[in-house]
UniProtKB/Swiss-Prot annotation:
Family: Belongs to the RRM TRSPAP family.
Binding partners and assembly: Component of the tRNA(Sec) complex composed at least of EEFSEC, SECISBP2, SEPHS1, SEPSECS, TRNAU1AP and tRNA(Sec). Found in a complex with tRNA(Sec). Interacts with SEPSECS. Associates with mRNP and/or polysomes. Found in a complex with EEFSEC, SECISBP2, TRNAU1AP and tRNA(Sec).
Taxonomic classification: Eukaryota, Metazoa, Chordata, Craniata, Vertebrata
Name of the gene this protein is made from: TRNAU1AP
Protein's GO biological process: selenocysteine incorporation
GO cellular component: cytoplasm; nucleus
GO molecular function annotations of the record: tRNA binding
Domain RRM: 3-86, 96-175
Name of this protein: tRNA selenocysteine 1-associated protein 1
UniProt keyword terms in alphabetical order: Cytoplasm, Nucleus, Protein biosynthesis, Repeat, RNA-binding
Biological role: Involved in the early steps of selenocysteine biosynthesis and tRNA(Sec) charging to the later steps resulting in the cotranslational incorporation of selenocysteine into selenoproteins. Stabilizes the SECISBP2, EEFSEC and tRNA(Sec) complex. May be involved in the methylation of tRNA(Sec). Enhances efficiency of selenoproteins synthesis.
Primary subcellular site in the record, as a coarse category: nucleus
Amino acid sequence: MAASLWMGDLEPYMDENFISRAFATMGETVMSVKIIRNRLTGIPAGYCFVEFADLATAEKCLHKINGKPLPGATPAKRFKLNYVTYGKQPDNSPEYSLFVGDLTPDVDDGMLYEFFVKVYPSCRGGKVVLDQTGVSKGYGFVKFTDELEQKRALTECQGAVGLGSKPVRLSVAIPKASRVKPVEYSQMYSYSYNQYYQQYQNYYAQWGYDQNTGSYSYSYPQYGYTQSTMQTYEEVGDDALEDPMPQLDVTEANKEFMEQSEELYDALMDCHWQPLDTVSSEIPAMM
């Protein structure tokens, strides 16, 4: 049975042929592309639906290329994909996420997802966090719908090898707040990561993430509506993200400490409170 993906952030020049070629360049074959247009003006609404042979193919494509550079796009853009479930209510089942650290630059979303889903079927997605230039920050998230599998993965995959060239570092990521907003019309499956807290021994380190710089859900009543009607979009930039356990350069820290200490010593020596010659010396009057 055919299945579709939603694709957003399109430029007006991106027609059906452009989208099909972009997927083909990434090694993916699509059955059809439907560009959504305003039914009154005929102007593209900025998004489309891409049809695949079956759900498995669509899901594989989503995890493989979502967030990667879009071939031929000017200015440069990235694939922005999401699941589509026409007329169905959103899946509000609980989600259990893990923070994955010490990722090497070669690890992408698809590799992160495949590493976990082959052992833990409830894994629903993986996201490697990128900086503004598209380079990995060295960490990401994986999401599960089964809490037991999340806990198993945390224990069984801690320090595991096979994902990139370094052992992975795992910790539980807890959603900061579950925000369920009422959306009119039919609703689509939300494939997103919200804000998380990362708990370690003595502190919380906070970061946020949205799928490809955004967490979105959208409704689709009929063709011809504008994009603002179809999609509610919430921006949370990647610049708010940071590794909760950065490496400490002890040598550099000691150097800075000594430099600051020398500055303090010099300042004290230059002030008017000079040491006395002897214990019995008279204390000079203040000027």
